[in-house]
Amino acid sequence: MIKYQIDWQSFKEKYIKPKKGEFPTGTRVYKGFQGSGKTLSMISDIYQCRTIFPKAIIFSNVKLKNIDYHFIKDSGDLKKALETQNGKDGVLVCIDEAHLFFNKKDGISLDVITCISQQRKDRRKIFFTCQIWEDLDVSLRKQVKEVVTCHRVGRLQINKIIDGESVRFDKQLGTWTGQTIQYNIFKHNERLYNSYDTFQKIINNRDYERNTNTLPIYYSQDRAGKKIVVK
């Protein structure tokens, strides 16, 4: 026979509902192969976040345009992004190609996992993009609140948002599945294309280590196609 232990005193205690409109928290991963629109989808959400929460502090390793933000160029900047406090106004941290930084081969340091796992307390939202879900370190995958599967059909972007806690590998289907929360659909446009550096590339990750002060080297291109180091 199963017994139940009920704390009757707790029913007398006052409960304060969370305030509506507070800065959202949790990790969202945009996944998809090259050309699927995952980076553009993240960029779109960054600008929407800025519109709704104008006082939020934004960190990004993508070079953004016409918006106040802090560029993440090395591990020191990343550490600062994960530790910055901004009260109820929130902090948004955006990492493109996260699988190059936090992969299952190299693992993730405990301090990074600690910062990510305490996002709700810090009013922090983290956006990652990656090409392959399983390339992310498993300790990071366990912290993901939402997985956005990105699909591009012409200039139409169709994204399926999945509950991160429900993601499981289906052996019969041979793929990762999860509970669908909603679909987001938008059309590609010049305003979005011009809101970030579309030529920026991460081409080198061999020098990155969890306990060093180096991250991948960023390159851009001028109109003639000449490579330019982004400092």
Predicted regions and their residues:
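Pre-Walker A adenine-sensing motif
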Residues: 3-23
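Hydrophobic anchor at the beta1->P-loop junction of P-loop NTPases
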Residues: 30-32
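Conserved lysine of the Walker
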Residues: 38-39
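Post-Walker A helix-loop "phosphate-sensing" segment adjacent to the P-loop in P-loop NTPases
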Residues: 48-57
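Conserved P-loop NTPase motor module
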Residues: 146, 160, 166-231
